[in-house]
UniProtKB/Swiss-Prot annotation:
Record bears the keyword Transmembrane: yes
Signal sequence coordinates: none
Residue intervals passing through the bilayer: 74-94, 102-122, 215-235
HAMAP family with a match to the protein in the record: UPF0283
Membrane topology: Multi-pass membrane protein
Organism of this sequence: Actinobacillus succinogenes (strain ATCC 55618 / DSM 22257 / CCUG 43843 / 130Z)
Keywords for the protein's UniProt record, in alphabetical order: Cell inner membrane, Cell membrane, Membrane, Transmembrane, Transmembrane helix
InterPro entries xref list: DUF697, UPF0283
Superkingdom assignment: Bacteria
NCBIfam families, alphabetized: hyp_HI0043 (TIGR01620)
Subcellular locations according to the entry: Cell inner membrane
Record protein name field: UPF0283 membrane protein Asuc_0957
A Pfam entry, by short name: DUF697
Amino acid sequence: MNDKRVFNHVENNAGNEEEVFRVKREFSETAEIIPDLTALDDEREEKQALEGELLASQFEQAVRPRFRWWKRAVIAVAVLFLGATVAQSVQWLIDTWQANQWIYFAFAVVGCSVVGLGLSALGREFLRLRKLRQHLALRAESAVEFKDDFEIDKAKKLCGEITSSLGMDAQHPTVIQWQKQLNDGLTAREVGELFSKNVLYPIDNKAKKLITQSAVENGIVVAISPLAIVDMLFLAWRNTRLINRIANIYGIELGYWSRLRLMRMVFINMAFTGATELVQDIGLDWLSQDITAKLSGRIGQGLGVGLLTARLGIKTMEFCRPLTFNKDEKPRLSHIHRELLTSLKSVVLRSDKSRKKQNV
């Protein structure tokens, strides 16, 4: 009799693989597609970082222009001319004194005084320009030093140099408050952030208030004034004064040439950024403001001039600040445009009502 044979079924053989079933996906034609904007935000942040580095390099090129051979030749000729003028003035003074020609001696004294005043003015301009270059170098160094992989001692030393450039000593209340928050567990970047929040934050608020005040005043004057030439001259004077006052807030004393170079960099930066940054700063609120501005041409003019003044002040503030702004610290036009629009509407509409009453 044959033996019974039993066959066992092996489910997981080396030659047989288990078939995997997946859930069927169905797509609706009317379903709303919500894109993932995370990649776009990251790309925008990278673009802003690259743009900031580009603007910093442009500012450095504006303050430190390249010396070409013809510039060196002009400087050499100017130095020789000044030296010859000083030598001739001194020689004229000595000759008239020895010859007892008192009238010519008086003219020689006046000439030497004028030459001395000119040399002192040139010396002050050179010192102010040098201070602006030192501020630029300090700002560029702070952009590199305040990173996680740098030493804390270097970051603290750099903060001390920035404090000295701002005209503060170690006993200043904000500096003492910053020093109390320091400990060995902090990184260089965190040291810079604490310094910015404690020491630079009050200075930033002062500059922001000045920018808002200037923007509102310029917008109101342009909205009320009927003369375009007067508006242009007024804005040129006010904007130049705004740049000087912001620079003084951050401890920078501008001379003639340093002021021209700073203004040049600010205007170049404003031209490069253009309307794109303006729309990003203001956002969708611009649409409602535009509709309101269409109700009155004067409100529209005042709004445009006020925003231009505010943008000029913000760019000057960015270049004069010894530390670069973080993403949350950077001032934006959206912080100013509401107050500007409210002030313009109240002033212009009030003037319109008064004129109607006078006509009646």
